[in-house]
A protein has these predicted regions:
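Residues within the DNA-recognition helix of helix-turn-helix
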Residues: 70
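Alpha-helical residues within the helix-turn-helix
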Residues: 58, 75-76
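N-terminal helix-turn-helix DNA-binding core of bacterial DNA-binding proteins
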Residues: 18-65, 85, 89-97
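Amphipathic alpha-helical dimerization/coiled-coil segments
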Residues: 1-26, 95-129
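Residue-level detector of secondary-structure transition/capping positions
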Residues: 50-51, 75, 106
Length: 129
């Protein structure tokens, strides 16, 4: 996961503690940013690599103004970056965490559709980590 966070050693208690430290509202705001199909399409395209705003709008089938509005929101939330190059702004995912969020959401929905379920983590197993 990066930044010293080891998913294998994270217990439910530490996730709760971290949520209180970071702020549940900030985490909810980040997740809400993923709550529209247009933003998900933008992030999915940017997962393939950086892209100019005009090309991005075409790639995701949006009007330029609507795409720019969504990009501004995603940028303000720290999910994408924008770098001016001449007359264009090149957008990219902020970091690999954004790609991981998208990948995990897709993986979860695919599991739901297939009726699959990961083995639940028991309190005993979590303590043994």
């Amino acid at each position: 996961m990066g930044h010293g966070a080891d998913a294998e050693n994270t217990t439910a208690a530490t996730v709760r503690e971290r949520l209180e430290t970071v702020g549940a509202t900030d985490v909810a705001t980040t997740l809400q940013a993923l709550a529209t199909p247009s933003r998900l399409r933008i992030l999915a395209r940017l997962q393939e690599g950086p892209c100019a705003a005009t090309e991005l709008a075409d790639a995701v089938g949006m009007e330029q103004s609507a795409c720019s509005h969504q990009l501004r929101l995603l940028r303000n939330l720290g999910l994408v970056t924008g770098e001016r190059r001449g007359r264009s702004v090149i957008y990219a995912l902020y970091d690999n965490h954004v790609a991981e969020l998208l990948e995990q959401a897709l993986h979860h929905v695919e599991h739901l559709r297939l009726g699959l379920r990961d083995a639940p983590v028991t309190a005993e197993a979590a303590g043994a980590r």
